């Protein structure tokens, strides 16, 4: 999300990074409104799968469902890797060692399985704590960044134009349509999640009433925060945004170690919360397909805590 994507976006578009996030927010808002409208009429689990099946029939629904399960599982795997690498960097371990990362990854999956087996109450508590940690870290960063900008001259964005790689070529490429689209996709990744919110709507209270309100509101709040954090970071130290090799690039912008720790811990809490959400929502897409008899029905079997265990194992396997 916002902790992992800014560096890649800044390397593509330089000083235009904050504007790219605004453009990505606009696209996300359009899709969010679409999902919000659909959630009024279809309250089954599965989100995009359930909506497309209701609108276009079984064949399209099946295609969207399978695509969604695979893509969501892969995204879950990427996010899980991010959590492991961030945790390793916090404890001073080598985050590039594949053996260590793999052990951490499998350990994380076991922890997520245990959390899901306990039930939705624990999931809700963890999600709320991670949200508070994420918003708190980003909010503190924005406020601190504004103070730094007010009481200092800030950085010169033109410094990005003179950055060269080992071959003497500009690190920031020429701004073209292709570069814009690539950067937009990278920034859009920070907004992903709203399309999964309705995946477990059958386990929510009054989804037809609450989801149409929650999805657009969440996108609006997130867009403001994300724009603020990228804007402030680019004006504090744009060179660090582009050249840093750290997993959490935003921490490299600040020289203050306390701020760095706040950002890294906030990133870890956020990414862990996203993994918890992914472990809850992703299996339920495949479960929804099983309920519609488009995949074997044994994927609908749940534990006493309400976990579709076979669907969880399948999606976790794809993530691994």
Each model region followed by its residue ranges:
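The first (N-terminal) embedded transmembrane alpha-helix
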Residues: 1-5, 189, 318
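Membrane-helix boundary/coupling elements in multi-pass transport proteins
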Residues: 3, 44, 67-82, 191, ...
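TM-loop-TM module centered on a large, flexible mid-protein loop between adjacent transmembrane helices
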Residues: 50-51, 57, 89-94, 165, ...
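Inter-helical loop and helix-membrane interface segments of multi-pass membrane transporters/permeases
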Residues: 80-108, 152-180
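Membrane-interface loop-to-helix entry segments
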Residues: 87, 100-158, 192, 215-220
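Hydrophobic, small-residue-rich membrane helices and short re-entrant helix-turn-helix hairpins
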Residues: 118-128, 194-225, 290-305
